[in-house]
Amino acid sequence: MNSIRKFERIIAIDFEFATPPGEVPGVNCMVAYDICSKRWWKLDQRECLDRRSSPFPTDPSTLLVCFYATAELNCFKVLGWEMPARVIDLFVLQRALYNGLPLNWLKPDLEDQKLGRGLNDSLLFHGLHEFVNPEKKEMQQLSAAGGPFDSTTMGALIEYCTSDVAATAALFGKLAPKISQLPKGLDWLIYAGAYQKAVSSMEIRGVPIDYPLFTKMRENWEGIKTGLIEKVNANYGVFGG
């Protein structure tokens, strides 16, 4: 498994979505690009929701390349698509390579810039300036609003999503030769992707709670607090309210 060449498809992918507080993502669109065949897939919201499976194979012959994979895996989950067998995350790869080192310290020409760990900053760090999207924050806010979207707005979202996928593919080209620097190389990175699939399952399922008990506690919270205060104060006298 320690060779990228074994994969029939290496697919960079990105979803745009909206996630209301406490809810699972609502998918707005998806764009994917096979780095090997140079084939694109572009799906709007309705096309995503109407599909029962991914438009490309997700078996072990496909390597899915993401930047912050949990977000994309969550979208697979909510759409009911089969989870990809092999996933790598360029965000994780970059952190593994440079963790603890501010990126601007490593590049003299960027020493005056405070670089974060997001996609745009990673592109700058690796000299991929032409892929930096200056409208990224605005487009993220547009997607987060959740629609409904007219055809013009949906077209803009797909165009933005396409630019992120192109950037992810370009960043993969820069980082792929460095995978061998990891202690277990590609195997380690794929194991990290398997962990992110588990994280995605937890995020989509949510925190398991006893909801009837939670409701009862919430309805009686003031009395519970008063009882706790009285119990603690009997021994320590720390609450003077």
What residues fall within each predicted segment?
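Conserved "right-hand" nucleotidyltransferase catalytic core of DNA-directed polymerases
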Residues: 1-16, 21-29, 38, 113-114, ...
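Active-site-proximal helix-loop-helix substrate-binding element of RNase H-like nuclease domains
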Residues: 21, 28, 32, 36-52, ...
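Short alpha-helical segments and helix-capping/turn motifs at coil-helix boundaries
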Residues: 13-16, 48-54
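Flexible, charged surface loops at secondary-structure boundaries
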Residues: 3-7, 55-61
